[in-house]
C-alpha cells in the first residue's frame, strides 16, 4: 500500500487533539515511513505576504494573491517551509509527488509569488507531519484515518474550512455521521 498523493482524513475520534478535523496530503510514503502536510489548518494571522516580509523577499506585482494564509503543515520542523504547487520546473529543490503536484522547499519559488512565473496553484505550509516505519499503517488499522486519492481541486481551490468535509465526501460519506469510536469485528 502506497499512500503518496492521497489524503488522510482525520476520524472524529481525534477530537480535542492536534489533528482534529485535519486533512493531510501525503507527499511521500515508502518502506521507511511517511511525510505529509496538513492542508486545512491555517497559521493564525500569517499570510503569504507576511511570510515574504519575514524572509525579506519584496512583494511583487499581484499583491492580492499574497493574502492567502500559510498552513500549519504539522508539528514537526515548524521552522521549515514547504510549498505544494502545480508542476513547474526551474526551482532548486523540487520533487514530483504526482502528475498534478510538486513540493518545493527552496526559497526561489517564493520570489515568483505574484509574478507571471508563479505556478498556477500554490499552497505554502510551515512544518510537516511524519510517521516512522509502520506507524501510519498501524494508525490506519486503529481507525485513526480515512484515506482517499488526493484531489487537486480540494487541495488548492476548496475553501479551507470545507476541506475536511469535502475530502470525506469523495468516499461517499458524510463525515458528520461517523461515530467518534470505532470497533473491530
UniProtKB/Swiss-Prot annotation:
Q: Which InterPro entries match?
A: AlgH-like
Pull one GO CC term from this UniProt entry. cytosol
Signal peptide annotation: none
Report the family membership. Answer: Belongs to the UPF0301 (AlgH) family.
The record's section on PANTHER family has: UNCHARACTERIZED PROTEIN YQGE (PTHR30327), UPF0301 PROTEIN YQGE (PTHR30327:SF1)
Q: Which HAMAP family match?
A: UPF0301
- This chain's protein is named UPF0301 protein HDEF_0602
Amino acid at each position: 500500500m502506497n499512500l503518496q498523493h492521497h489524503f488522510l482524513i482525520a476520524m472524529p475520534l481525534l477530537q480535542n487533539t492536534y489533528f482534529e478535523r485535519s486533512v493531510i496530503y501525503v507527499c511521500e510514503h515508502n518502506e521507511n515511513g511517511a511525510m505529509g502536510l496538513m492542508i486545512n489548518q491555517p497559521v493564525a494571522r500569517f499570510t503569504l505576504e507576511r511570510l515574504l516580509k519575514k524572509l525579506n523577499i519584496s512583494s511583487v506585482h499581484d499583491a492580492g494573491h499574497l493574502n492567502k494564509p500559510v498552513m500549519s503543515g504539522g508539528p514537526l520542523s515548524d521552522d521549515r517551509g514547504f510549498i505544494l504547487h502545480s508542476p513547474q520546473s526551474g526551482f532548486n529543490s523540487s520533487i514530483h509527488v504526482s502528475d498534478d503536484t510538486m513540493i518545493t522547499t527552496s526559497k526561489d519559488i517564493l520570489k515568483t509569488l505574484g509574478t507571471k512565473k508563479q505556478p498556477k496553484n500554490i499552497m505554502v505550509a510551515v512544518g510537516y507531519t511524519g510517521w516512522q516505519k509502520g506507524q501510519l499503517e498501524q494508525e490506519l488499522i486503529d481507525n485513526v484515518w480515512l484515506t482517499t486519492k488526493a484531489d487537486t481541486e480540494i487541495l488548492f481551490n476548496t475553501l479551507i474550512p470545507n476541506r475536511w468535509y469535502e475530502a470525506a465526501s469523495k468516499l461517499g460519506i458524510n463525515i458528520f455521521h461517523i461515530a467518534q469510536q470505532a470497533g473491530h469485528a
